[in-house]
């Protein structure tokens, strides 16, 4: 049984946002589920040094946000967004929300670069925003000029990677930095949108069935070259 926080006043409204800010030179390694006791709340893990998710997920959290950005606040103390300058989020091994216990509607992955080598699940929407950005709480990104070395790919999904949700939205904002899918499985019950401010390389596995599927529209946009190999299946018009 998960005990509630005894420092919170039970006569006041429950927490809506739970921020776990990590100050470390090492990436956070999350190998289990984070459970919210009481009313549903957004769970945020922020570590500029990076985050490794291997069997991570949330229970009783409407929204799960993993970010390498530094949280920014409004004058009233509410969360304004994140300043992302560095750090990689890696999803591997046991994946994210792979356990049937999860009831997470929204998953946000906000980092300089994101690597997907296992499955990611959310009931309503998966949003990935990669690049050096200021990102608000609605995942709207404003790019920050960068003078340091850039990653080769802002978002890189391997053949063992996958995403399963209603809406799937992936955007790489950094100029000249690409987005790549190396045969990972995509299943969007509604729409799939992928945008790259560099090249976009989208490879589907060599099977009879399309491994990129959406019941609605599929949108692939690239500032530079767009290379697609394999099958796409869209139920949109």
Residues covered by each model-derived region:
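Solvent-exposed adhesion/ligand-recognition segments of exported proteins
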Residues: 1-188, 195-198, 209
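Binding/recognition "hotspot" determinant
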Residues: 87, 151, 191, 196-237
């Amino acid at each position: 049984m998960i005990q509630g926080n005894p420092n919170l006043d039970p006569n006041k409204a429950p927490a809506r946002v739970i921020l776990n800010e990590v100050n470390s030179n090492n990436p956070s390694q999350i190998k289990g589920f984070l459970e919210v006791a009481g009313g549903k709340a957004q769970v945020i893990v922020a570590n500029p040094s990076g985050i490794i998710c291997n069997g991570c997920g949330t229970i009783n959290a409407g929204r799960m946000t993993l970010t390498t950005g530094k949280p920014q606040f409004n004058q009233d103390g509410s969360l304004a967004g994140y300043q992302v300058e560095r750090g990689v989020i890696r999803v591997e091994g046991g994946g994210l929300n792979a356990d049937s216990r999860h009831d997470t509607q929204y998953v946000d992955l906000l980092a300089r670069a994101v690597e997907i080598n296992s499955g990611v699940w959310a009931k309503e929407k998966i949003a990935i925003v990669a690049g050096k950005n200021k990102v608000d709480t609605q995942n709207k990104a404003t790019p920050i000029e960068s003078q340091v070395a850039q990653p080769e790919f802002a978002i890189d999904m391997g053949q063992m990677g996958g995403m399963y949700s209603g809406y799937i939205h992936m955007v790489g904002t950094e100029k000249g930095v690409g987005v790549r899918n190396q045969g990972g499985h995509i299943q969007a019950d509604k729409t799939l949108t992928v945008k790259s401010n560099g090249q976009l390389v989208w490879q589907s596995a060599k099977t009879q069935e399309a491994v990129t599927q959406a019941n609605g529209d599929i949108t692939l946009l690239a500032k530079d070259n767009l290379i697609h190999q394999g099958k796409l299946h869209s139920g949109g018009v």
